[in-house]
Every structure is written in structure tokens, then in C-alpha cells.
Amino acid sequence: MASAGGDECEGAAPEADRPHQRPFLIGVSGGTASGKSTVCEKIMGLLGQNEVEQRQRKVVILSQDRFYKVLTAEQKAKALKGQYNFDHPDAFDNDLMHRTLKNIVEGKTVEVPTYDFVTHSSQEIRDMFHLRLFVDTDSDVRLSRRVLRDVRRGRDLEQILTQYTTFVKPAFEEFCLPTKKYADVIIPRGVDNMVAINLIVQHIQDILNGDICKWHRGGSNGRSYKRTFSEPGDHPGMLTSGKRSHLESSSRPH
């Protein structure tokens, strides 16, 4: 996600007198079908951005899915059989992703590619995010969501499960789960955790209002703490199967 941020910490200046606002990047990660997109959409809704015309929005969602490499004819044939590994980092055009994020941070206009899931037409990136979130959802719940979603896409159940055990689960454990230590915020239960969602929304609202002093005081790149958000009834300080985030190696639904 990206929102319009600012650079001043000396008190609120009239909007017309403020310097040009720089985008504030938030990386959202998690396992396949953990609810990453749902969390982002919920945040957008609470910020009132879904009712705003696309070009007038102050907060936008940029999906890593858009940066899949274009498949060759041979790779497309494998993909149709569920034999292509969409979860490996090499499946993404990381150079294009890095250039796009860099241009966004610099306030430049960018063109984002669109990936078609029917035709299948690094640290460097991780460090570009000012805030990193990880959406934590139980693995059984994620698998059931993925199965239901892919069946709706016309996929065969046996193919779905084979792809999950062959590619998705191993890639999550090798590439996504190890990024746990880099997350600033963990969101247990995803979109159901409104304590976390509301607090993140408030932070974004502060940034949109130009009140970002707290981010600058907290340390480099706007990160001042690592935290797992719990709701009433949760054991204080307890991480329930916590996982952490960054866009570069997240295990996205395919």
C-alpha cells in the first residue's frame, strides 16, 4: 500500500504551505490466502478511499501479483497442469518491482503491469518499505480458502492440492516464513482483528494529515517498534503462530 506522506515535524502548517508530500510505503505479507488483500481492502474502506475516484485517492493498493514474469509457451503449458512454481521469488520481475517502488517514492508517475491468472499472460525491495505488516492466519484456514478460491477459478481439486504440497507450502516455509524477523507489525487472524486494523488505519490517517513526527522520532525509515496486535481475551504478549512480512517474498495466491 502507498499513501501520501510528508516531511515536516515542527507543527501543522496550512496545507497550501506544506512541502510536496512523499509517498509512505507499507508492505503487507503473509501466507497464501491469509487475507492480505482483504485486510488492505478493509483499511481502504475505513479510510473512505473506496468511494473516492481512482485518480483522486490518497491511498492505493499495489499487488505483487502484477509483477509476475511473462511466461513462455512451455511455462504456460506447465502452469495449466499446475506444474509451474508461481511461489518461487524467481517467478517475479524483481527489477521492475524495485524500479516501480523507487519511482513511487520519488513521486514519479508509474505504469503498473496487469497479470492475467487465466492466461498467465530481496532485501533491496524490503528496505524500501516504511512499515511492514504480516497477516497471520492459521494454515488450515488458508488452505481451505485457497481450495475454494481455485475451484471457483475452474481448477481441478487434485491439481490444487498437488500444487500446494509441491510448490506453495515449501515456498512459504523457505522464502516467506523466514522474513518473520523483519516485520514491524503482526496481525493475528487477519481482517478479524479489528484492534490491529483500526490502529493501522489511525497511523495512516496521521500520515495523510501530515502528522508523521512519531515516525521520524522512532528511528530510520519510520520504524520504531515490532509488535503483535492482540484483542481482548488473547494472552498478553503471546504470538499465536505469528509470521512476519515483506512484499519481496510473500506467498501470493495463484
Curated annotation (Swiss-Prot):
Positions with a binding annotation for ATP: 30-38, 192
Gene3D superfamilies linked: P-loop containing nucleotide triphosphate hydrolases (3.40.50.300)
Phosphoserine found at: 230
Annotated positions binding substrate: 87, 115, 120, 146, 155, 163
One Pfam family linked to the record: PRK
InterPro entries: P-loop_NTPase, PRK/URK, Uridine_kinase-like
Composition bias type Basic and acidic residues, residue spans: 245-254
Segments of this protein annotated with the region Disordered: 1-29, 224-254
EC number: 2.7.1.48
Reactions mediated catalytically: uridine + ATP = UMP + ADP + H(+); cytidine + ATP = CMP + ADP + H(+)
Protein keywords: ATP-binding, Kinase, Nucleotide-binding, Phosphoprotein, Transferase
Name the UniProt record assigns to this protein: Uridine-cytidine kinase 1
Gene name tied to this protein: UCK1
GO molecular function, one term: ATP binding
Pathway the protein acts in: Pyrimidine metabolism; CTP biosynthesis via salvage pathway; CTP from cytidine: step 1/3; Pyrimidine metabolism; UMP biosynthesis via salvage pathway; UMP from uridine: step 1/1
